[in-house]
Structure formats: C-alpha cells, structure tokens
C-alpha cells in the first residue's frame, strides 16, 4: 500500500457526520486511506466514526487506533469483523499499547504494555479466523470463542501504532505494518523506521510485505506564520499532563531532534500557570516547524515529501482545522 491518506479524530470541533463527509471527499480525490485517531483525550469514539465513514465511502481503506485493555479482545475482534463486513473488506486496525498513563486514565491496574498488546493482537487474530479458539496468556484468557458469522476476511492488517523504541520493535515483531505517531519530524521517522526494519529482520519476516504509515499534521495557509499558529495547539497536546509522560521521553530516545529536554519544565510550568492556553503559547515555532507540515501549499507539499523520503509509504494527512480540510484535499488530490 502506498499513497496519501486523510486523518480525523483529533479535532474536538469536528462531528462524526463531518468526518464521514470528509472521508467521502478524500475518496473522490484519490486518497487511499481514511484514518481515525481514538485518543486518550476522550474525543469521539472509533466505532461510531468508522461506521459513519464506512457507509459514506466505497473504496477507501479505513482504519483507526484502539487502545487495548479498554475493550476486551473478543469485543475488539467482533467489532473489527463487523466493520470489515460493513465496508466490504476495507478495514485495517491499529491496536495500541495501554501505557500506565492510559491505565490510570481508564481506572485500570497497570500491567506490562508490551505483554498486553502482544496478547491482544494474538487473541484477536485467532478469533478473526472464524474458528473456535481458546487463548491462555499472562493476561488474556478465554475458552471456546467463535464468531457466530463468517468474517469477510480471516486476516485484517494490523498497523501497530508505536512511538518508543520498545513499541517500534514490537510493531516489527507482530504487526503487518506500523502507524507512526503524529507530531514527529521526518528525522524521527527515519530513525523509527530503521528500528522497525531491524526488528522485522530479527523476527525473520519479509520487509517487502511490511506497511509503513504515519499520521502527518498539516496546516495550510497563505501566510506561513498563520499556518504555524493553526497547528500549534496540536503540538501542545503532546506536552500536556496527559500525554507528556509517554510521548516526550520516548520520542527523544528514538532521536527526535526538535524536542529539547530543557523545555519540558517550561511546558509543565506553563500548564500549571494557565492551562491549555498558556501551554500553546509556550510551544516554540521550532517545534511546530520541525514536527508538522505547516506553511503555504508548496511548503506543505515539500515537507510531506520529506516524510516519504524518510521511508513512509502512506502519509496520512490530518488538517489542523476544519477550514483547512478542503484545501488539503485539493492540494494532495491524485
């Protein structure tokens, strides 16, 4: 799979109906994937969004992130099989690790994120075959589970969302591909892909069959500074108290050159002083310039090309604001 995708789900002002409409428009313009991010920020849920998108489109590959443990693996497999049926076999899934921060958010006891992700993926894949299966792991345990309907496909691709070195290695070991995080530079992407590629090789798997996708934050305006300001809020979310513990350090350890350790305390102090507004104001232009594709149409095209040059096969583009969505589709139409 190669090409350009369209991403939604992070903007709290965009309704499910609006998301589905933009997915349809993306399909009309030759985009290859529509992707929804179900986030720890408690925006819209993935099942509702993908049902709407599935009914609004006919050819677009559709996918979403879903954090494991929040849903039982049987429920996740059942939902995935149902959505794959609804869409005529167009689904991919990005099951993500339940970090300690996620566990705290959802009132769960912390359990090893790599272990739970691996077991959820293994269990879901077995259930998706349509056979009667039992699974007994450290965390996941069930007997005699079988879908009561024949799945459209017995294997739906899993693009594992990963940010840290551990997550990237795990994606190479168990995924059909990887979905690299948003708010990352092309330099980070190149480093991350090298880690994944090594893990694929060590697992004895075929790199040619592996899919590399990434959500790329895009902000298109006629004025460069205005484009930076439109997407600065999304960069800031990666440094709020919810996401900071599992985002900043892991990205730096992979080699993200635009996050400076000395800035972390500044972001924390800004949040304590004035919440989201103060945090957004504290994010330097260099962060926005480096870790998003923001600027004029030509500047954004050039930046997205740098992600492809780094090895990303499917650049999944997410507009920073609703008023930019149409322009993004026009700029990147096939």
Task: Go through each PLM region and give its residues.
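An alpha-helical appendage that flanks or caps ligand/catalytic pockets
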Residues: 111-147, 189-306
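Glycine-rich, proline-tolerant flexible connector loops at the mouths of alpha/beta enzymes
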Residues: 33-56, 68, 104, 182-186, ...
């Amino acid at each position: 799979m190669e090409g350009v995708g369209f991403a939604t789900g992070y903007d709290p002002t965009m309704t499910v109906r609006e998301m589905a409409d933009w997915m349809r428009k993306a399909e009309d313009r030759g985009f290859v994937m529509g992707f929804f991010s179900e986030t720890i920020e408690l925006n819209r849920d993935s099942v509702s969004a993908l049902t709407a998108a599935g009914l609004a489109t006919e050819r677009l590959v559709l996918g979403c992130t879903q954090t494991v443990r929040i849903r039982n693996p049987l429920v996740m497999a059942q939902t995935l099989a149902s959505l794959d049926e609804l869409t005529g076999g167009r689904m991919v899934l990005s099951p993500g690790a339940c970090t300690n921060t996620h566990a705290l958010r959802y009132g769960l006891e912390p359990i090893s994120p790599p272990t739970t992700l691996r077991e959820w993926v293994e269990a879901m894949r077995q259930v998706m075959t349509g056979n009667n299966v039992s699974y007994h792991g450290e965390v996941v345990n069930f007997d005699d589970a079988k879908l009561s309907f024949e799945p459209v496909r017995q294997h739906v691709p899993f693009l594992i969302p990963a940010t840290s070195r551990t997550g990237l290695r795990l994606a190479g070991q168990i995924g059909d591909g990887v979905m690299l995080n948003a708010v990352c530079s092309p330099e980070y992407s190149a480093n991350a892909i090298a880690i994944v590629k090594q893990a694929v090789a060590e697992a004895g798997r075929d790199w040619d069959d592996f899919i590399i996708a990434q959500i790329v934050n895009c902000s298109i305006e006629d004025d460069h500074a205005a484009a930076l300001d439109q997407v600065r809020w999304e960069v800031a979310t990666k440094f709020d108290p919810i996401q900071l513990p599992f985002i900043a350090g892991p990205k730096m350890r992979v080699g993200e050159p635009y996050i400076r350790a000395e800035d972390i305390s500044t972001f924390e102090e800004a949040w304590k002083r004035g919440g989201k507004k103060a945090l957004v104001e504290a994010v330097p232009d260099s962060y926005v310039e480096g870790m998003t594709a923001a600027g004029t149409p030509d500047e954004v095209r050039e930046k997205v090309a740098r992600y492809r040059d780094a090895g990303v096969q499917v650049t999944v583009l997410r507009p920073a604001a609703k008023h930019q969505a149409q322009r993004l589709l026009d700029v990147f139409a096939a």
